[in-house]
């Protein structure tokens, strides 16, 4: 028996709009486990850097993402799970690095503009990683226990469900 989607609805979105969805990204069990290595990640990073260097007016092309939205509260990633996972890991690394830079930055008038710009970037990343608006961000920063239950991506692959049997 083959189940077909009743409707395929393509949507062009920015990466920010895609990642800021409130539903949990879910990797179905029939999808392969995360397998990108440093070389794959480096290619993505180089592609992003090249886009930034071009100072292009068109949005960055993240690639085609296919999502099954039939499960309430979840976005089942049919295609694009490797890129999505890698991009979320990249955002977490950027969050850590920007936080470190801000903590070590001199609080001078000359650095004020850079500090504001970095803080805005950090706020945007925080909103994606912790599903938090500015008000909720302040609550989380005061009590990090409030971030413990936040889930962005769920991997229910066979490899994850039966990892003890794979030894």
Predicted regions and their residues:
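Glycine- and hydrophobic-rich flexible loops that cap the catalytic core of alpha/beta enzyme folds
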Residues: 4-167
């Amino acid at each position: 028996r083959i189940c077909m989607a009743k409707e395929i609805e393509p949507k062009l979105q920015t990466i920010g709009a895609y990642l800021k969805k409130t539903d949990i990204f879910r990797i179905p069990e029939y999808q392969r486990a995360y397998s990108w290595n440093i070389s794959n990640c480096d290619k993505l990073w180089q592609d992003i850097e090249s886009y930034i260097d071009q100072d292009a007016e068109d949005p960055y092309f993240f690639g085609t993402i296919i999502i099954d939205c039939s499960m309430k509260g979840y976005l089942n990633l049919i295609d694009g799970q490797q890129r999505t996972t890698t991009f979320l890991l990249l955002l977490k690394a950027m969050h850590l690095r920007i936080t470190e830079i801000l903590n070590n930055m001199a609080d001078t008038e000359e650095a004020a503009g850079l500090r504001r710009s970095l803080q805005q970037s950090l706020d945007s990343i925080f909103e994606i990683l912790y599903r938090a608006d500015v008000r909720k961000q302040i609550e989380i920063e005061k009590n990090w226990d409030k971030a413990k239950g936040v889930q962005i991506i769920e991997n229910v692959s066979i490899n994850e469900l039966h990892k003890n049997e794979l030894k």
